[in-house]
Amino acid sequence: MQADPLFTDEIAIDLETNESRIVQKEIYLENVSEWTPENPVLYGIQPMDDLIERFGFREIKVSGKYILLNGRPIRIKGFNRHEDHPMFGCAMPLQAIEQDIQIAMDLGANAIRTSHYPNDELFLDLCDEQGILVWEESHARGLKEYHMQNPYFQKQSEDCIREMVMNHKNHPCIFVWGILNECASETLYGRDCYTKQYRQLEELDRTRPRTSASNKHKNDICLDIPEIVSFNLYPEWYSDQNETAVDCIQDMMQWIRNNPVTRNKPFIVSEIGAGALYGYHTRTKDKWSEEYQCIALEHQLRAVLESAECCGVFIWQLTDVRISRERFENRPRTMNNKGIVDEYRRPKMSYEIVKDIFTSYDDYFETNL
């Protein structure tokens, strides 16, 4: 059923042959319904040429260590997701994208990070419809300082950011913009790049906070710039096996709260996880077994979600994905095998562990702000 329109208007436009024009108009609407994960209300714009652009009304704000969605402190329970499929590669059709979102929702997730590039408009449309929050980020990841010194790097980054924001800013699901995953944020040259790109984001869109997933941890010198602090942490996988997930997470949270630059900012664990080969089982719960992934993920997720000092987590990752053949070391099958489901979307043992943990925590923090 189609509801009565909130607002109608006509704008007369005269165009010459082969001429194109951009038309902008600001309007003020009253008595609108908020877009929330529980009730993702969408409104549409329908020009006479049949282009339909949908949007939603919601407010994203940072207040101290919390991210507020319509005034309520949201707890992020999310996944990192690559656009990759064994049948379709990165050109995934609507049905395959829908399947990924349904898997994430069944697991109890309320957010997805587009690691590490802007995503298909179909994906964002579906997240708008289903009430899934999205961290969308530009296409730059794992770069050393010498990579960032390439004379084409900054312009390409700026072009990507501009296209991402201008094309996708009307999607209410996007709650944060990200840049430069695991890049040279510990160097002065890197800081200059981060500063320029954060400034560009602010100029393009002041309604959303900014962040960057860092693996430089206590050596990062760019944490004063964005509104949200995000770290990629892999306790009980890459790190010293004697360091527990609880020790790692608590140490990082304590450092963040003791650091004058970060103590009053929200903190997100932007990546965490462990690998498992689908169908590989061992009684001794060795690395790469489905049993070990269950143990590591349970330790990691409970360490993060039990703390009110962290406003959320993105598991690395939703599905197993292909990687470069040159990076075969520590990558069986030349795949990143940290998915909760494999590349064919078959669930591993950890599926039920993650689902049980995610669904046991509310989507919002109980706090008086």
Q: Model regions: which residues?
A:
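The substrate-binding groove and active-site-proximal loops of carbohydrate-active enzymes
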Residues: 33, 82-95, 103, 107-115, ...
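Aromatic- and acidic-residue-enriched segments that line the glycan-binding/catalytic groove
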Residues: 128-133, 147-158, 162, 192-193, ...
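Short hydrophobic/aromatic-enriched beta-strand-loop microsegments
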Residues: 131-138, 228-234
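Secreted/periplasmic carbohydrate-active enzymes, especially glycoside hydrolases
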Residues: 1-134, 160, 166, 173-176, ...
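Short Asp/Glu-rich motifs
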Residues: 86, 123-124, 146-147, 222, ...
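Substrate-binding clefts and catalytic carboxylate motifs of secreted carbohydrate-active enzymes
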Residues: 173-177, 198-200, 211, 219-226, ...
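Catalytic metal-binding/acid-base residues of hydrolase active sites
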Residues: 117, 139, 180-184, 206, ...
